[in-house]
From Swiss-Prot:
Annotated Mg(2+) binding sites: E42, D115, E118
Domain DRBM: 156-226
Organism per entry: Shewanella sp. (strain MR-4)
Protein name, per record: Ribonuclease 3
Residue stretches spanning the membrane: none
BP-aspect Gene Ontology terms: mRNA processing; regulation of gene expression; rRNA processing; tRNA processing
Localization: Cytoplasm
Length: 226
């Protein structure tokens, strides 16, 4: 857990300086850690993200159908995309978690990371206004919005990675579960993904094997773009 004195560093990473730093602290606080947690901010941020991305897609693709717009929005706001954004910001280093969540690796769990991104969006909105949120989110999403196309990038990460490697006539990815933690009703899966083009495996952590594989595949795709 990152000491609070480092929150200004996170602000620089986010590209936003909070007037009320307590809003950011709350956005990073999981319900396991305190009564004043981030779930209400997450609710707010989810709605703001949806309207900003919907508006951006509507104007970017004037001829796209409602179905294509909905699928593109779903791709951009779904949990694995938010998890990648959280990892880029290193949010796991700043989360405030209860002892149980901390011990079970909650700072890596995809749902907690994705929820924290939405909570931060809600906190920024309360600290500023919708227009500030819009500009910041469009900056965060600039590369993804530039790449997305109607009917193209709506496949999940595992499918996209498989098709990419098949197109190059390369071996398919190898996914292995390397760790399972927690009780049967609340497990955390750690999966590694290996491909020939990367010297080291990439790790995905999630509440199910399938989700962990998707997160690992998405990170491999990000690395292959570089």
């Amino acid at each position: 857990m990152e000491p609070i004195k480092n929150l200004p560093r996170l602000c620089r990473t986010l590209g936003y300086e909070f007037k009320n730093i307590e809003l950011l602290t709350q956005a990073l606080t999981h319900r396991s850690a305190a009564n004043k947690h981030n779930e209400r901010l997450e609710f707010l941020g989810d709605s703001i993200l949806s309207i900003v991305i919907s508006d951006a897609l509507y104007h970017q693709f004037p001829k796209a159908t409602e179905g294509d717009l909905s699928r593109m929005r779903a791709t951009l706001v779904r949990g694995d995309t938010l998890t990648l954004i959280a990892k880029a910001f290193k949010l796991g280093d700043y989360l405030f978690l209860g002892p149980g969540e901390l011990k079970s690796g909650g700072f890596r769990r995809e749902s907690i990371l994705a929820d924290a991104v939405e909570a931060i969006i809600g906190a920024i909105y309360l600290d500023s206004d919708l227009e500030v949120c819009r500009k910041l989110l469009l900056h965060w999403y600039a590369e993804r919005l530039a790449e997305i196309q109607p009917g193209v990038n709506q496949k999940d990460a595992k499918t996209l990675l498989q098709e990419y490697l098949q197109g190059l006539k390369k071996p398919l990815p190898d996914y292995q579960v390397i760790n399972i933690e927690g009780d049967a009703h609340d497990q955390t899966f750690t999966v590694e993904c290996r491909i020939d083009d990367l010297s080291e495996s990439v790790i995905g952590v999630a509440s199910s094997r399938r989700k962990a594989e998707q997160i690992a595949a998405a990170q491999v795709l990000e690395l292959l773009k570089k």
